[in-house]
């Protein structure tokens, strides 16, 4: 059986990955803080010496308020690279790491994997730096390596500051939900699709950068109204088109994901939101 180490298995995306991994024939080994602190080099080294996986799927990173500028991004970049080296030293063959669309220099056109890079936060800088050093290391050490760039995310048990959770929670409490920048269009992808896409990528021989996205955008206004309509709370939703220096469109080109990796998203917005709401109502 194919043995894979999965990091971030309690996170928004990682927690959805175990089932598709098992369905694809992987034996899944969780690298959790309880068993192995990713920031502790000795523990990481011993973990990979013990398990000797052929595959590595890496989601673990800092999230939530303050994550974009937190100094922990530096530590996680270093720790993730050390983990890849430990993986390689113990017989590892293929690794897939998660990146972010915030590595890109945004434009109104759908972003392709070869689009210019211009990270605007420490988080994005360190993600991009990690990809560069891991890609170079993998090439020199005969490791099959891919970098999946995640765009916008929605799913189950989100942190309260995220847009989807904010809207749902406010409306369920019969309180006003305000969306200030309804004109912005974003490429949102359901966590079950994201995790399944990463598993498909891991189980392929595709190397390099791959956008993990729907390839389509939805305005924040349309997205919020869809949630409100499903909850029959349209009267509690307030939409503004406030001035902002944020890019109008952040949409990915998913041609490599769909044509080369062979992954097609399973869920549309309506079906995915129904799944999310069904666990709350």
Feature-to-residue mapping (PLM):
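C-terminal substrate-binding subdomain of Rossmann-fold SDR/epimerase-dehydratase oxidoreductases
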Residues: 18, 174-175, 179-281
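NAD(P)H-binding glycine-rich loop region in Rossmannoid oxidoreductase-like domains
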Residues: 42-77
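Conserved Rossmann-fold NAD(P)-dependent oxidoreductase catalytic core, especially the SDR/UDP-sugar
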Residues: 81-122
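Active-site helix of classical SDR
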Residues: 122-129
């Amino acid at each position: 059986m194919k043995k894979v180490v999965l990091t971030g298995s309690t996170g928004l995306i990682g927690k959805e990955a175990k089932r598709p991994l098992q369905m694809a024939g992987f034996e899944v080994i969780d690298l959790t803080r309880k068993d192995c602190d990713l920031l502790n080099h000795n523990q990481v080294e011993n973990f990979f010496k013990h398990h000797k996986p052929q595959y590595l799927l890496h989601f673990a990173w800092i999230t939530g308020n303050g994550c974009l500028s937190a100094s922990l991004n530096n530590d996680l970049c270093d720790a993730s690279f050390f983990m890849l080296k430990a993986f390689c030293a113990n017989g590892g063959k293929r690794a897939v790491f998660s990146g972010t669309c915030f590595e890109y220099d945004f434009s109104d056109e759908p972003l392709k994997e070869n689009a210019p890079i211009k990270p605007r936060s420490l988080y994005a800088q360190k993600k991009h730096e990690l990809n560069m050093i891991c890609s170079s290391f993998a090439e020199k050490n005969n490791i099959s390596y891919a970098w999946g760039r995640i765009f916008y995310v929605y799913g189950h048990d989100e942190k309260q500051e995220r847009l989807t959770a904010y809207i749902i929670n406010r409306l369920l409490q019969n309180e006003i939900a305000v969306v200030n920048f309804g004109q912005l269009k974003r490429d949102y992808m359901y966590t079950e699709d994201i995790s399944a896409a990463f598993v498909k990528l891991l189980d392929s021989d595709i190397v390099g950068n791959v956008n993990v996205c729907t390839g389509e955008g939805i305005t924040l206004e349309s997205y919020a109204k869809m949630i409100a309509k499903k909850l029959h709370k349209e009267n509690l939703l307030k939409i503004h088109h406030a001035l902002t220096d944020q890019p109008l469109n952040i949409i990915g080109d998913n041609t490599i994901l769909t044509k080369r990796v062979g992954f097609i998203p399973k869920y549309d917005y309506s079906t995915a939101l129904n799944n999310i709401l069904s666990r709350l109502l």
